[in-house]
């Protein structure tokens, strides 16, 4: 299976495949790294909520672990990637609930919950528009604040993108932060569409790395 081939390629290039026992460290890392990220500020009604973000990351990690590939730069966990396979259309409701989604609803309220649900529907529709869900989906690239500027993102991305080049695969991502766009363009992604998250002023860039 291709998932196993990618995992082998990542390991061969010195990357670390994340275990569930690493999740709490990644959650803490994310809570600091995503401070003031525009989409998360929007989710929580205009003010960044670190605990809310950490719980959202927790839900994502547990929901995506079995089907996706979660890997880090090393066992030091300076940065990590969540990569999801072709055919991904969003977190299934049962998985969301089972892995802590009710905490978000209870603690963040129905408005924040609805913003997240509506955003995922919007994002998945845009992904399907450009890839027909045949893409490997780079759901998350996160580097700790302390390790930013130390080429951790390059260490995480280059082996993966080399695999896609060799095997003529497409990789899709989105970002909601203007300064991230040239970083991804440097890695070979191209902007397919720039728009706004519905009912907000948050930018949304759909980007593709296409080797077909």
Stretches with model-predicted labels:
Residues 66-84:
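Conserved beta-hairpin
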Residues 154, 166-168, 177-194:
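Conserved active-site alpha-helix within GNAT-family acetyltransferase domains
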Residues 139-148, 172-182, 196-202, 209-211:
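Conserved beta-strand-loop-alpha-helix junction that forms the acyl-donor binding cleft
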Residues 47-69:
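Active-site rim helix/loop that mediates acceptor-substrate recognition in acyltransferases
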Residues 80-142, 198:
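Conserved acyl-donor/pantetheine-binding loop and adjacent beta-alpha core of acyl/acetyltransferases
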Residues 143, 149-162:
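Conserved acetyl-CoA-binding loop-helix of GNAT-fold acetyltransferases
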Residues 14-28, 36:
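A short beta-loop-alpha structural element at the N-terminal edge
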Residues 134-136, 163-176:
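Conserved GNAT acetyl-CoA-binding A-motif
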